[in-house]
Amino acid sequence: MSNGALPNRSDVWLQSLGWQPTPEQEQQFERLFQLIVQANQQLNLTRITDPPDFWEKHLWDSLVGIAPWLQPDSSIQRQVSFSVDHSHPLKVIDIGTGGGFPGLPIAIIKPTWRITLLDSTQKKLAFLQQVNAELGLENVETCCDRAENLGQQSPYRESFDLAVIRAVGPASVCAEYALPLLALQGYAVLYRGQWTAEEQEGLVAATSKLGGELIAVSPVKMPHSQGIRHCIYLRKIKTTDPKFPRRVGVPARKPL
């Protein structure tokens, strides 16, 4: 079990995202860290429990994907060539949330947004419900299901403004999970490590079949480890064909 507190990285938040958490949000981040570490031995939530690594790979990494929504000018700061509407709260789904990332950090800093944490493991979701109560988060709900099922169900299908998906599978598979859940003009953020031209070609082809388009690929340097991450942004531009998503397991076995 890891000991110690999260590092204070207020300067890094500001330099990298043009944004800083409030003192209350910093306290919620710290409490989230402690709760994850305490439960980790029983639930196997994450291999990352060292405080600096947790800050970078779970907190900073979760929020870098929504940089365009943090500040009106952050799309310029993050070299993302599109602008978003900051005038209304968003309805968000975190697909395959696991230990609650990126959904919980997003819920902490965006209390007016409605966040749905989707996962197929009820034990993890039961823990996340306890975390929500402990952190006083009233804008989070959990859903135990598979994205392939949820994407075919009302009221979930084509109802979300934003889908975030991290460490779930190949990009084209993530697109099939996410795009059917998005309302028209909704966005999906795919959190990736390395990114290749071949992956991009496959994603563009899959996205076009699902009613979406690839609008930006944003490479970002991690502030502590100096590794490169990529945030892939998709936009829903037309209604998804009713045959998508396909049955549970099919997208992963037979990617578009």
Swiss-Prot record:
Q: Name one Pfam family in it.
A: GidB
Q: Name one GO cellular component term.
A: cytosol
What is a single molecular function from GO for this protein? Answer: rRNA (guanine-N7-)-methyltransferase activity
What is its subcellular localisation?
Cytoplasm
Q: What is its EC number?
A: 2.1.1.-
Keywords for the protein's UniProt record, in alphabetical order:
Cytoplasm, Methyltransferase, rRNA processing, S-adenosyl-L-methionine, Transferase
For S-adenosyl-L-methionine, which residues are the binding ones?
A: 96, 101, 119-121, 147-148, 166
Record flagged with keyword S-adenosyl-L-methionine: yes
| Family to which this protein belongs | Belongs to the methyltransferase superfamily. RNA methyltransferase RsmG family.
Which HAMAP family does the record cross-reference, listed alphabetically?
16SrRNA_methyltr_G
The protein's matches in NCBIfam families, at most eight in alphabetical order, are given as: rsmG_gidB (TIGR00138)
Q: What does this protein do?
A: Specifically methylates the N7 position of a guanine in 16S rRNA.
What's the protein name?
A: Ribosomal RNA small subunit methyltransferase G
Q: What high-level taxonomic lineage is stated for the organism? A: Bacteria, Bacillati, Cyanobacteriota, Cyanophyceae, Acaryochloridales
